[in-house]
């Protein structure tokens, strides 16, 4: 009788162990949704928590991802009008600067980095328009400017390029832009082509 008693509990223990293992296996083998993608930020400042996180992007269109990054920053405003504030500081840190510097080129660089492009990465506006990357006058006239290309504004008093932003689209003799450090904030704008000094292409 004792033997039957132990045999019963032995069988019961094996059954419990088998069911427990099967349950665990079922949980482990649940299918991950086919559309699931785990993404990491291309911006090390965001990745390490030094800036406010914004959404990552799924998709293969790099130009669109760059503009999406910029559009999500529309409305960012300086804290006191002195090139400051947490988001502005994040853009400047991305190019190795502290607070207080003009940040339009840093903003453009940050948007490219956010989309996974290491270059350009420079706070100096003229550096974003090397001759090798500029569009020719003929190309501009043919409507070759594309989404996420860069535009430059020239300062006669400084005798150099002193503002840069992103082209969102070209509409005839106008461009629609997203730019940082415009009226102390991130803004969309419409600018006539005649006011643009140069365009550059960092993607092709």
Language model region names:
Residues 27-29, 33-117:
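N-terminal capping segments
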